From Swiss-Prot:
Its main location: mitochondrion. InterPro entries: SAP_dom, SAP_dom_sf. The keyword Endoplasmic reticulum does not apply. Residues 230-247 have a biased composition (Low complexity). It is found in: Mitochondrion membrane. GO terms for cellular component: mitochondrial membrane. This is Altered inheritance of mitochondria protein 34, mitochondrial. Pfam families: SAP (PF02037). It is a single-pass membrane protein. The lineage of its organism: Eukaryota, Fungi, Dikarya, Ascomycota, Saccharomycotina.
């Protein structure tokens, strides 16, 4: 028998599939949301199978970072800084430092974190993790805000009482009460005839005035008293006239009139002398 050609021989891939068939991994389950919205979610543990097409003469990219370093080394410094900024890494440093940070971040990516997280749990148990929703954005109620602005504030710091005419008549403080009590004690309730004073000045009670007065008068005593009063009145009027005559001129007026009379007397005296001298001549 002649040997078959190499092309007719089954490939190594077919041999491997026959020896160990490839089992397809089940699809990833969807998130099971519980409650209103995205409040809680559960992650079910599943096995993840990844297929890599690696050349026979090249090393796998999972164990070496040469391919990634070559991809980032082709970038300039500005692009590397943008990559670090997008990943939340430190931006300062040289180009080699930036490449190392990015490569370390890629190696510690979500696959590594997911594998370390699932290693602590058994495949039969389920771990529940709380998923925080996106920040809620609430629009303010403009109508309610305008209504609140238009209404006056109810909690005032200082309460101003309303104006009233009775505010001054009612004493409130201790000093006002003391003054009102002192004024009531000093006031004579019989100061006005025919009126009874009360603490409230607006209210007064008028008493009847005594019109008919009954008196017993002695005629002799009445005449003597009348004559005595007339004589006293005449004497008083004379004294008043003398006093008023003396008191009509003030001391200044008296000096003025005295000086005037003295000047007139001197003028008359010297005028007569000059006239006599002329007569003699």
């Amino acid at each position: 028998m002649s040997l078959r050609r190499a092309k007719s021989l089954p490939s190594l891939k077919n041999i491997a599939e026959v020896a160990k068939p490839i089992t397809k991994a089940p699809p990833l389950p969807l998130l099971a949301f519980e409650g209103p919205g995205l409040s809680t979610c559960r992650w079910y543990p599943t096995t993840v199978r990844t297929v890599h097409n690696t050349p026979s003469k090249a090393q796998t990219t999972l164990l070496s970072t040469a391919k990634k370093e070559s991809a980032f080394s082709a970038m300039n410094l500005k692009a590397l800084r943008n990559e670090c900024r997008s990943r939340g890494l430190q931006v300062s440093g040289r180009k080699s430092d930036l490449i190392e940070r990015i490569v370390d971040f890629e190696l510690k990516g979500p696959l590594g974190r997911r594998g370390t997280r699932r290693a602590f749990h058994s495949p039969g148990t389920s771990s529940a993790s709380v998923c925080r929703p996106v920040d809620k954005v609430t629009m303010p109620d403009i109508a309610l805000t305008e209504r609140a602005v238009q209404q006056p504030e109810k909690n005032y710091i200082l309460r101003i009482p309303s104006l009233s005419r009775e505010a001054a008549s009612h004493p409130v403080t201790k000093s006002e009460k003391d003054l009102a009590q002192g004024a009531d004690e000093d006031a004579d309730p019989t100061s006005e005839e025919g009126r009874v004073l009360t603490p409230d000045s607006d209210l007064h009670i008028e008493s009847p005035v005594v019109i008919n007065k009954i008196e017993i008068i002695n005629e002799d005593d009445y005449l003597q008293d009348d004559s005595r009063q007339s004589s006293d009145s005449q004497g008083g009027s004379q004294q008043d006239s003398d006093g008023t005559g003396q008191q009509n001129f003030s001391p200044r007026d008296r000096r003025f009139f005295a000086g005037l009379t003295a000047a007139v007397g001197l003028w008359w005296y010297f005028g007569n002398k000059s006239a006599k001298r002329r007569m003699r001549k």
